Regions:
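Bacterial N-terminal signal peptides that target proteins for export
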Residues: 1-8
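C-terminal motif of bacterial Sec signal peptides marking the signal peptidase cleavage site
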Residues: 17-20
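Acidic-and-aromatic substrate-binding clefts and catalytic sites of carbohydrate-active enzymes
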Residues: 55-61, 77-89, 107-115, 138-142, ...
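Active-site acidic/histidine proton-transfer and metal-coordination neighborhood
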Residues: 77, 109-199
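Short acidic, glycine/proline-enriched helix-loop-strand junctions
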Residues: 87-105, 150, 164-166, 297
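Alpha-helix-loop-beta-strand connector modules within alpha/beta enzyme cores
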Residues: 92-107, 154-157, 191-195, 262
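A cross-family glycoside hydrolase active-site/sugar-binding cleft signature
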Residues: 49-53, 79-81, 103-108, 132-134, ...
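Histidine-acidic metal/acid-base catalytic patches
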Residues: 22-52, 59-71, 127, 190-202, ...
Length: 302
């Protein structure tokens, strides 16, 4: 049997499993890194989105079926950085058929520099307002010269995207937290970019991995972050400044299973300019871990 025949069956089984366990897992888990949650109150995050990279293998095989699975979980908002063999028009039609939306579109450095018009077309066709860059090319380790180049590029690309009514956000990836004076090179980038044209997407994993605190960063720059990636880190592990992990499955876990305190982060995020939050799960068992993570993150209250 071919993979294309197998995947729809897998999606159907996953949907059945999700529906069956939703009733069983209605209360917050007690063995995660989050602060203690109450049994009543307002949801901190009632409507999280998801990053398409989470379901990259499933999208590669069956785009409509994967969208159906995401919708069944309760997720309505997807950040795409890949069209998975479709045109932007075709993908938009599939989203519209399911009342799904795309609010952010990811593009890499090369695409932004060499195919800018296509990025604009795809983002606007999908309905995204935000264009996100998740990696700035550099020779490790990231240094002040790299940060200065990044500042120049971000200011320029942010202005160009604004001309098309699009907002540019840079997604931190851990390597920017090299110490520099009284702060880090991430501080240097934030402080030297134009807040009118340059925004940021906080990936909480890639803040914790190099040893920093997402809450402190949100409190320091409450008006600079527009987007957030929610991704958990295995308990007991520590990271570095490379911006990479040796093995995703060794260091990353489903939301609520690791050491990151999402209760505290989402509390702090209430006082910031963040518009959209996206679940990003990079482990192998996303068909089970994402529904569980969704139930966990939407159970947090204040």
């Amino acid at each position: 049997m071919t993979n294309t025949k197998i995947l729809p069956l897998v999606l159907m089984l996953a949907l059945f499993s999700f529906a069956a366990c939703s009733e069983q897992e209605s209360s917050p888990r007690s063995d995660h890194g989050d602060s203690q949650t109450g049994t009543s109150g307002e949801q901190l995050l009632p409507d999280p989105g998801v990053v398409s990279f989470t379901f990259r293998n499933q999208f590669d095989e069956d785009v409509p079926g994967t969208l159906d699975f995401i919708k069944e979980i309760g997720i309505n908002n997807i950040e795409f950085s890949n069209l998975f063999g479709k045109t932007a028009e075709e993908l938009r039609a599939l989203l519209d058929e399911r009342d799904l939306i795309c609010t952010s579109f990811g593009a890499n450095y090369r695409t932004l520099t060499e195919n800018f018009d296509q990025v604009v077309h795809d983002a606007k066709t999908l309905g995204a307002r935000h264009v996100r860059l998740a990696w700035f090319p550099h020779d490790a380790p990231f240094d002040l010269d790299d940060a200065q180049r990044a500042v120049d590029f971000f200011n320029d690309i942010g202005r160009r995207l604004a001309e098309h009514d699009l907002m540019f956000s840079y997604h931190n990836h851990g390597y920017e937290f090299v110490e520099d004076g009284d702060g880090t090179l991430f501080d240097y980038i934030v402080q030297n970019t134009d807040p009118e044209y340059v925004h940021f997407q906080m990936d909480v994993f890639w803040v914790v991995w190099p040893g920093h605190d997402p809450v402190e960063l949100l409190e320091r720059y409450p008006d600079r972050f527009r987007l957030m990636h929610l991704k958990d880190m295995r308990k007991g592990v520590t990271g570095d400044l490379t911006g990479r992990t040796p093995d995703r499955n060794e260091y990353m876990v489903g939301l609520g299973d690791g050491q990151i305190d999402f209760q505290a982060i989402l509390e702090a995020a209430q006082n910031t300019s963040i518009e959209y939050f996206y679940i990003e799960d990079e482990i192998e068992d996303v068909m089970n871990s994402v529904p569980r993570g969704y139930r966990h993150i939407t159970s947090l209250t204040h």
